[in-house]
């Protein structure tokens, strides 16, 4: 038995098996492993010299040569009965880094083949200051295997083929898509129960338009996910000028718009260098988001247009509004603005996030929008590192709204520069005035086991309007390193 296992482990080397990462034939067999196993059982049972009856996905990617098909079958199912696996690569951190190519076909279909992709925990390099702060805690989320939902599977490698695949396929593999300028990857017409898998590197032509949305997604019972080694590259460096959505050249304001999405999942995506806000999530119910890596590290550096400031600005990770029963978990964000910002919605859980370099975990700003009610939001088991704020609730002056039942629990802060806990009701035109108003009611707010350190600023800052704040509870809260704390509510003062 041991001898058989040992031989099996050396079989790929002995056969000279190609890597699925670099060879389209091996990749096609790896991606469609179930179909490959069925085909190879027949193909290797007898001597076959013709290419008739071979599934198109294998034929086209194996150069229409029976010897390539035979070799791929021989290499299928080695040590563990699955296709030979290659070492997973970390997400690319620059636009010049290409990642695992998927099958080089334009729009290949196979019927009723659930496709499974495997991903594992990976790391990307942090800046020196981040590594010094919490190197051991900067592990990226493990990304679990995913599967399609049956039905027709389409592999798309050309932007022009996306719309037809969305209309006719229940499983869609978007492989190394290059979306031309002013061309949205439109996933709003997905079939109920559809699955979309991003593979390779997804790129976009430069579009200097604040109303342009590079990716738009909607649907019911939909799964959006990513294959091992993929990256969705927003090409933010082409737009960054230190001003974000506050001025400068026009740039896409929202990179990925998720709207009208019900009972669906977004998981295991690697997103790099988005221009301004990354996710705009609106009008969803029972949406689950998990295992995402949002890496805007490159935006920390100044460029020729940013006048010495970080080039990226207003790069919120997740902006959530008018959404109910949403769960966001197990994700990693390095950006230059809010890690998460909830401006309206109910029954929202944000759990196990790692937030670096931005403005923390936020409610708001509330007021002056079409919907100004937040009810039932929990931030839990998360870290906010080297950011301006830790936990923040803010409302706009001279507006109305409600913020009810918000809990921050088991939150660790480190290297916070402005406010550890911050509740303000004095925002006007995007800035604080120091004069709070009471049109937005903030009630039933709790902080439980929120601890950490400041690099500067105030540990606690609470500025409520007259009578507009009530029932704040602080349990096991301990933030140190700041100075000049100021709290006008509760009457007992700061924690």
Curated annotation (Swiss-Prot):
Its EC number is 3.2.1.15. The active site is at residues 337, 359. Residues 1-16 form the signal peptide. Disulfide bonds join 154-169, 339-355, 464-469, 487-494. It catalyses: (1,4-alpha-D-galacturonosyl)n+m + H2O = (1,4-alpha-D-galacturonosyl)n + (1,4-alpha-D-galacturonosyl)m. SUPFAM superfamilies: Pectin lyase-like. PbH1 repeats lie at residues 261-283, 284-322, 323-344, 374-395, 403-425, 469-492. One of its GO terms (biological process) is cell wall organization. Glycans are attached at residues 295, 371, 410, 444. Keywords: Cell wall biogenesis/degradation, Disulfide bond, Glycoprotein, Glycosidase, Hydrolase, Repeat, Secreted, Signal. GO terms for cellular component: extracellular region. Its main location: secreted. Belongs to the glycosyl hydrolase 28 family. Involved in maceration and soft-rotting of plant tissue. Hydrolyzes the 1,4-alpha glycosidic bonds of de-esterified pectate in the smooth region of the plant cell wall. This is Probable endopolygalacturonase D.
């Amino acid at each position: 038995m041991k001898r058989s296992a040992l031989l099996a482990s050396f079989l790929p080397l002995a056969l000279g098996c190609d890597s699925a990462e670099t060879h389209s034939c091996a990749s096609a067999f790896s991606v469609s492993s179930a179909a490959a196993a069925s085909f190879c059982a027949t193909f290797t049972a007898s001597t076959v010299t013709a290419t008739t009856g071979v599934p198109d996905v294998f034929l086209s990617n194996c150069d229409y040569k029976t010897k390539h098909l035979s070799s791929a079958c021989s290499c299928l199912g080695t040590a563990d009965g699955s296709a030979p696996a290659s070492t997973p690569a970390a997400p690319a951190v620059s636009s010049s880094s290409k990642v695992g190519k998927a099958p080089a076909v334009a729009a290949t279909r196979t019927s009723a083949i659930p496709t499974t992709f495997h991903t594992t925990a990976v790391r990307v390099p942090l800046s020196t200051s981040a590594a010094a702060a919490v190197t051991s805690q900067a592990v990226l989320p493990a990304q679990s295997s995913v599967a399609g939902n049956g039905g027709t599977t389409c592999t798309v490698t050309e932007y022009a083929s996306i719309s037809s695949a969305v209309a006719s396929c229940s499983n869609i593999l978007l492989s190394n898509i290059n979306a031309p300028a002013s061309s949205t990857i439109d996933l709003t017409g997905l079939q109920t129960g559809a699955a979309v898998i991003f593979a390779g590197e997804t790129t976009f032509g430069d579009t200097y338009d604040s109303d342009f949305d590079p990716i738009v997604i909607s649907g019911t019972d939909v799964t959006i996910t990513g294959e091992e080694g993929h990256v969705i590259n927003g090409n933010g460096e082409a737009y960054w000028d230190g001003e974000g959505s506050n001025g400068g050249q026009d740039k896409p304001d929202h990179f990925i718009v998720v709207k009208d999405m019900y009972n669906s999942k977004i998981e295991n995506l690697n997103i790099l260098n988005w221009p301004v806000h990354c996710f705009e999530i609106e009008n969803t119910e029972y949406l689950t988001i998990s295992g995402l890596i949002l890496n805007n590290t490159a935006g920390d550096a100044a460029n020729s247009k940013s006048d010495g400031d970080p080039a990226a600005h207003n790069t919120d990770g997740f902006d959530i509004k008018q959404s109910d029963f949403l769960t966001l978990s197990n994700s990693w964000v390095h950006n230059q603005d809010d890690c998460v910002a909830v401006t309206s919605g109910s029954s929202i859980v944000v759990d196990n996030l790692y937030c670096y370099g931005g403005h923390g975990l936020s409610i708001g700003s509330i007021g002056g929008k079409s919907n100004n009610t937040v009810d039932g939001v929990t931030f839990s088991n998360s870290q906010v590192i080297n950011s301006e704020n830790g936990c923040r609730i803010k409302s706009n002056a001279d507006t109305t709204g409600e913020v009810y039942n918000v809990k921050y629990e088991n939150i660790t802060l480190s290297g916070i520069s402005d406010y550890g806990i911050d509740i303000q009701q004095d925002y006007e035109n995007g800035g604080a005035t120091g004069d709070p108003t009471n049109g937005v009611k903030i009630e039933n707010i709790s902080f439980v086991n929120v601890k950490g350190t400041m690099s500067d600023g105030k540990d606690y800052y609470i500025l409520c309007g007259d009578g507009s704040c009530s029932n704040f509870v602080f349990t096991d809260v301990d933030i140190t390193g700041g100075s000049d704390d100021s709290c006008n509510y509760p009457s007992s003062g700061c924690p």
